[in-house]
Amino acid sequence: MAAQKSFRIKQKMAKAKKQNRPLPQWIRLRTNNTIRYNAKRRNWRRTKMNI
């Protein structure tokens, strides 16, 4: 990745960074909850974003 990024690339990377976090614990405690973990977690080495 270049040090000088275009603004659109930087926006995409910022969104991906925000999405790449674990599930909040209070969501797991809700009634009738079936979500156990964030299935869309991304590791920077294993899975690339294709941008």
Swiss-Prot record:
One of its GO terms (cellular component) is cytosolic large ribosomal subunit. Residues 1-22 are annotated as: Disordered. Coiled coil: none annotated. It comes from the Eukaryota. InterPro entries: Ribosomal_eL39, Ribosomal_eL39_CS, Ribosomal_eL39_dom_sf. The keyword Ribosomal protein applies. Residues 7-20 have a biased composition (Basic residues). Keywords: Cytoplasm, Ribonucleoprotein, Ribosomal protein. It holds the Pfam family Ribosomal_L39. One of its GO terms (biological process) is cytoplasmic translation. Component of the ribosome, a large ribonucleoprotein complex responsible for the synthesis of proteins in the cell. The small ribosomal subunit (SSU) binds messenger RNAs (mRNAs) and translates the encoded message by selecting cognate aminoacyl-transfer RNA (tRNA) molecules. The large subunit (LSU) contains the ribosomal catalytic site termed the peptidyl transferase center (PTC), which catalyzes the formation of peptide bonds, thereby polymerizing the amino acids delivered by tRNAs into a polypeptide chain. Component of the large ribosomal subunit (LSU). Mature yeast ribosomes consist of a small (40S) and a large (60S) subunit. The 40S small subunit contains 1 molecule of ribosomal RNA (18S rRNA) and 33 different proteins (encoded by 57 genes). The large 60S subunit contains 3 rRNA molecules (25S, 5.8S and 5S rRNA) and 46 different proteins (encoded by 81 genes). eL39 interacts with YIH1. This is Large ribosomal subunit protein eL39. It comes from Saccharomyces cerevisiae (strain ATCC 204508 / S288c). The lineage of its organism: Eukaryota, Fungi, Dikarya, Ascomycota, Saccharomycotina.
